[in-house]
Structures are given as C-alpha cells and as structure tokens.
Amino acid sequence: MMQTIRQAFTILRQNPLLSTISILGTAFAITMIMAIVITWQTKYADLEPEVNRSRCLYFSAMHMQGKENKDRNNYSTPSAAFMKECIQPIPEVEACTAFTTADVALVSLADGNNRLKVDAMNTDPEFWKVFSMQFLAGRALTEADRGGDMRSIVICASVARKLFGTTEAIGQQILLNRELSRIIGVVKDVSVTAKDAYAQVWGLYHTDELKVTGWWSYLGGKTIAVLARTPDDFPAIKQGVEKRVKDVNAGLEEMQMDIMEQPDNIVAHVNHVWANVGPDLPMLYLQYGIALFIILLVPSLNLCGLSNSRMQQRVSELGVRKAFGATGSTLIRQILNENLVLTLIGGAVGLVFSYLAVYVMRTWLFTNSQNIGTAGDFSLSMDALFSPMVFVLAFVFCLVINLLSAGLPAWLATRRTIVDSLNDK
C-alpha cells in the first residue's frame, strides 16, 4: 500500500501539470455530486428537529368534490378535524400532529415596546412528539395549556434574546398579534431548511377546529404529519385512512373527500407543491439520475484523456514490468491503485468545496414558495454535512471516477506487446 502511495506521488512530481489538472477535475466533479447529495440529505434525511422523517407520512392537500355535480370542486389543505376523524383512530399511528405553515406575526413586550416580526405557527401537543426540539428552558405545550385566561406559547432562543436579552424567559408575558401570551418554553433556533418544524413562535390552535359541523370542517389550512411505529406500518396506515375516508364520505350529503393518493412519504411531501396536482416522483428521480450521470461522465471522459497521456509516457516502464513477469491484470490493478490516490486527493478537495458551495448557495438551494421571506436563518445541520453516508458516497463516487478515467487507458496500455512497449519512443 505504501509503495503504491509513493509511486503515485512520484508520478505527481514527474507530471505536476497533468496531475494538478487531474486532481482539480476530480475535485470539480465531486463538488457538484456531493452538493447534490448534501442537499438531498438536508431535505429528506432524519435530521434534527425532523428526526422522524423516515417514519412519517404526510397530508398537505385535500380535494372536496360534489357527489352529484362533479364540476363542483374545492382544492385546499386538510384540517385538524380530518386528522381526528380519519387518522388518530388508526392503531398503527404512534402520534400525529396538525400544524399551520409558519406565517408572519408581530410580537412585543407586554407594554408594547420592542416590537419584532416573527414567524409563528399554530399546532397541537402531539407536535412535540413528532418533532424533536432542543429546549433551553421550560417545556413543550400540552393539552393542559389549552384554554385558560392567557395563551401559552413556546419561542425560539433568538426571539427570547431580542425581547429580554436572555433565554431565561419562562413565565414572561408578551403580546403576540396584540394578544397577551405567556412563555412556557424556549427552544434552540430551528433552521428554515426544516420544512415542517420551522417557526420562531409556536402556539396551540383552538379546540373548535377539531369539531365537525359539515363537509367544510375537513378543510382547514393545516399540514398533517403522521408518525408510524415503523415504516413497515405505512401500508396499514394508508389502508386505515382510506377506510375512514370512505366511512366519512358515506355520511356526507353534498360533497365527498378525495385525499388524492396521500399520504405522502417525505420525498413526495417536500415536492407536493400544488393542492390539485401530486408530485411526479419518477420524473424527480430521473432528473437526479441524469444529473449524476452527466456529472460523472463528462469529467471522467476528460480525465480519461489525461490518464491516456500519462500512460503514453509510461509505456516503456510497463514493458519492463511485463518482461519481468507482471501480468496485464496486475499492471491494471497497480495503475488503478496509483490513480486512486490522486482521485482521493481530488475527492477530499471536492468534498471541502462542496461544503463551501452548499453553504454559500444555501438560501437559493432551499428557498421555496412556502419559506420565501421568512425571518429565520438557512443554517445547515452538521449531521447532514458530516454524516457517514456523505463520506461513503464521496468515496464511492471517487472509485467510479477512478475506474472510468483510468480503467480504459490502463487496459489499452497493457494490451501492447513487450517489444512494442520497449521500443516506444
């Protein structure tokens, strides 16, 4: 192994220009590939506070259609009442929560001073079971916090500091949209990249939203996250929801519910943009596949030319090795191992560049119609940047680039006869 590394650095010193171009070419390819991987991890992997993405199903759209007049359509989002009637009774559901998208609100001290614009969300006590928040002080909202003479809320650390200069704000009273509210919890700031959990202030929606008074009660401006005990329970939950919807529709007179092939998994949920059109996942996967293929192929073809140039300079050396009994497969393996050292150097440089690229472009990469204009920060999770999966994939892509760029030139070089190799000028 050490001999291979020494040989690789000898080649690097002998051909500094070609070696530098090869390393930078590999780095460029790895930068683009790993930027895609890190973006995918940030959007879809289990990351704090959305640590249960792989165990969650989602409802973010609802269609009500006339039973007799099929031209009568209402596309919207589901309600807390829909969650109560059609999801909570299913035994495979560990927890489920309904929540609004974080929207602009105004907070200030109780006397009206120190006004701030924040992103506020209405949710329920189950929210804190589905999502994992880091509490710096206080506790989560519970059923006991509903009602009473004053609204209870949880705020993030940055809002607490701006209002009070400290995160020790438990029991303090503030005005939230001119309504006197009491702070019972302070949590670590949530990144805007957490599509569902992000907000700066969390409160409870009114219990009236759980009541059913007509078909319109199933529409309510909420997104619903359903936490399964294991992903293996997804089919049972889907079947359970479909059965409950069928039972509800049987009791409705004018309209009927259509959940449009929901619930979605995390990938479908993030890409479910329109209420009346579901995500096209095959096209999404095809686009990612084509992008990765092109990013791998084009640099590899260019690097293949550089490797071929290096092979032409080493033909005599390869001839001598063959004359002393080295087989073609042995030479190919040695060449690939030597080239892999340079590829790994380029891969390491590319991985660092990918971190910088994602950080610099994070707002552009993660901005969507839901979070545009939010007050929070698009901070990146260290778990997404430094997860074992990222390093494993970076190494795998380095192996692929190494095989594509050095494999063919090495095979062609070892195909030459000993006499031709030794007489090469």
Predicted regions mapped to residue ranges:
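Structured, solvent-exposed hinge/loop segments at the ends of secondary-structure elements
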Residues: 37-163, 167, 176-181, 363, ...
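Short loop-to-helix capping motifs
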Residues: 15-16, 230-231, 406, 417
